[in-house]
Amino acid sequence: MTDTSTQNTATPTDEYGAEIHPKHSFSPIEKTVESFGKTFTLEVPETEIQLDDSPTGPNEPVRIYRTRGPWAEPTKGLEGLRSEWIEARDDVEAYEGRRRNLLDDGNRAVKRGEASEEWKGSTRPTLRAKEGKRVTQMHYARQGIITPEMEYVALREHCDVEKVREQVASGKAIIPNNINHPESEPMIIGNAFTTKINANIGNSAVTSSIREEVDKLRWATRWGADTVMDLSTGNDIHTTREWILRNSPVPIGTVPIYQALEKVDGVAEDLTWEIFRDTVIEQCEQGVDYMTIHAGVRLPFVPLTTKRVTGIVSRGGSIMAGWCLAHHKESFLYENFDELCEIFAKYDVAFSLGDGLRPGSIADANDAAQFAELKTIGELTHRAWEYDVQVMVEGPGHVPLNMVQVNNEKEQEWCGGAPFYTLGPLVTDIAPGYDHITSAIGAANIAMGGTAMLCYVTPKEHLGLPNKDDVKTGVITYKVSAHAADVAKGHPGAHEWDDAMSKARFEFRWHDQFALSLDPDTAQAYHDETLPAEPAKTAHFCSMCGPKFCSMRISQDIRDAFGDEIDEALATDQKQSLVKDLGLPGFGRQSVDGIDSLSAAGEEEMAEEFRRAGSQLYLNRDEAKEVAEDLQKEAAAHGER
């Protein structure tokens, strides 16, 4: 069979061929590893941000997590990064696979006789596990095998590879990497690692085209999406997914019940296990890395939703609830879950066990229906682990702030610590058009408490299908939430990024501030609205305060005038009485113990010196010299005492 994965790739000529800021550069980490008797050189992407010098000396570059770029032309697709790794394990086989039919692309494709724009780029043999084999990263981890995927992840996360293997083996983290999506760069989802974000894209019956969805994919990953879900429900579902997979450097997730429903012309009661199973295999063969399966929506749970304000708001959940009621039978997803596990184990597809009964309003948060489903999901998680299949668990939804953390607690208790993946949650229902904000508040809160991945919400939530600009807004908003949680949890490198920004801000290094921003374009555009000239990029003020009222400039002047004396006072005072009495931390991020700070007496002494100087924020050179001499005399006298 012919593998055309490395043919015809080229650097794109559009905006995706450039870094998001001139100070950014692609700076990969390289490592040579041995795996299954073969040697591989890993090249793990990172962005290096060059910084200008400070008045006190040079600044080290800041390195941040990224996906690889620039990418190939979208009509040709990406190279198969993992193809050789998969082949080296010698536990997969190529086979013909199911024959694609036009109904896979929907009824309109059947009428046209073809999809609207067939994929003509790179193609590969379809792979599956050999008879009796399991090819999941969890299986390898449980056998004590460290794969190139695990090595790659460890370099990305700046951690020991054994930590990665142990977390995957225990089910507390997943590496979603279908063997038929070798273009994807290994990444890990788990509470012990950096918080990840997912971006949803996909067409609907009334809007969007294949090219638009591919552009959304590239745009989302450019701005930092760690995974992308294709939630297409309109035309050309199969072909749209093929274009997306062949161009995606990140894992792709789907909700296969959407496509299965299209195959029965949108009539939920006409769904069958056979149609759903065929759809799942179709998507496994294409390379989908994780699938949302609403197997926790069971017939006995549906009546629990009748008293809700907003009922069942999950599309997948409502489809399965409708099927259960129409047939008065248990869900075919729940009944056939073990067969799904067997299928997923052949391709290394991860479960994203869907919260089909999640609350759609804060009035319905944490009710019996939601938690009955979550407990069932816990049961299914442990069943999937028996097949070495990776699992993450989906969570709400709409939850007021005071009720958020119990969701983490119940998920950890019932689901054995499997990664939690939540949609927000939105913490209030009153802000249509701003639900990226209402949800980002809940997202930061729940991630701080242990959630591993956050599904973004765009400004169009509840209002319409997001466009390209909405996708970027959603991604950046959720990068803020994820990073804030990482800072709170103390993940390596998280605080250093903030510190670099704070230092650049205090030193008025405007270009560095833009470069260190999650969205450099917007940061610079806002600055330049009022101060567009290049000299303003070195000015020690912005348009908010102007030159006379900039607090940071005033602080710098104080340091210039009193810096040596302040340092000496900090070095000689060991009592920290005021700080200790108040139970406050000392200077810096360490505890009070062992940290020098100003005592109450020292503070009064410095305040008196400030008053003696005429309570002036600014002193000329002679005045500053006179004050410094007085301070030195008093310090000497204090030392003699």
Swiss-Prot record:
| Amino-acid positions noted as binding substrate in the UniProt annotation, renumbered to this chain | N200, M229, Y258, H294, S314, R315, G316, D355, G356, L357, R358, E394, Y421
Keyword Hydrolase among UniProt keywords: no
Q: Which UniProt keywords apply?
A: 4Fe-4S, Iron, Iron-sulfur, Lyase, Metal-binding, S-adenosyl-L-methionine, Thiamine biosynthesis, Zinc
- One of the GO BP terms on file: thiamine biosynthetic process
What this protein needs as a cofactor is: [4Fe-4S] cluster
Among InterPro entries, the record links this protein to: ThiC (IPR037509), ThiC-associated_dom (IPR025747), ThiC/Bza_core_dom (IPR038521), ThiC/BzaA/B (IPR002817)
User: Where does the chain bind Zn(2+)?
Assistant: H398, H462
Q: Report the EC code(s) recorded for this entry.
A: 4.1.99.17
Source taxon at top rank: Bacteria
Reaction(s) catalyzed by this protein?
A: 5-amino-1-(5-phospho-beta-D-ribosyl)imidazole + S-adenosyl-L-methionine = 4-amino-2-methyl-5-(phosphooxymethyl)pyrimidine + CO + 5'-deoxyadenosine + formate + L-methionine + 3 H(+)
One Pfam family matching this protein? ThiC-associated
Q: In which pathway does it act?
A: Cofactor biosynthesis; thiamine diphosphate biosynthesis
Q: Does Nucleotide-binding appear among the keywords?
A: no
Region annotated Disordered sits at 1-25
Q: How is the cofactor bound, in the record's words?
A: Binds 1 [4Fe-4S] cluster per subunit. The cluster is coordinated with 3 cysteines and an exchangeable S-adenosyl-L-methionine.
Q: Could you tell me where the Polar residues compositional bias lies?
A: 1-12
Any one GO MF term held by the record is: 4 iron, 4 sulfur cluster binding
Q: Name one GO cellular component term.
A: cytosol
Q: What does this protein do?
A: Catalyzes the synthesis of the hydroxymethylpyrimidine phosphate (HMP-P) moiety of thiamine from aminoimidazole ribotide (AIR) in a radical S-adenosyl-L-methionine (SAM)-dependent reaction.
The UniProt entry, under NCBIfam families, shows: PRK09284.1, PRK13352.1, thiC
Family, per entry: Belongs to the ThiC family.
- The protein depicted here goes by the name Phosphomethylpyrimidine synthase
**What organism is the protein native to?**
Corynebacterium jeikeium (strain K411)
